[in-house]
Amino acid sequence: MAERLSLSRWDEWFDLGSWQNPRLLHAEPSDRILVCPPALGDGYYQNIFLEDNITLVILDYRLHDDLVFDMAGERERIEFEFQLAGPQAGYSFFVPYFGLPEMSVKHARKRYFKIEVFFEPPILNTYFQAVL
């Protein structure tokens, strides 16, 4: 049976973690580290702030049960996602966010390991002005 979570942000189902977690490949004190609650699964979410309006995210987790996420909607930004393990391993995605409500399903006992790069609007505006 799937558990359903209603969230305002995708990452709010994680608990606060430490940058000194030995499972992390590399971490700095400025990184934001979140860990999967033991009741839901095992793993982490690492948020690395590269520069203003550019963030690198590393996710590596496995769930005990299926989870359904209902989200109010992410703020406007774009994401490049690279799947390293899990159901979509080897694939990459471009995901634009427009602030619209979303629904996502994550399956139990599958490893989700991916890298995400997020670009926020101010840097996007500069880029699109240069391109046009």
What is each of the regions a protein language model found here?
Residues 1-36:
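Short Lys/Arg-enriched alpha/beta "domain-start" segment
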Residues 34-132:
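N-terminal regulatory/effector-sensing and dimerization cores
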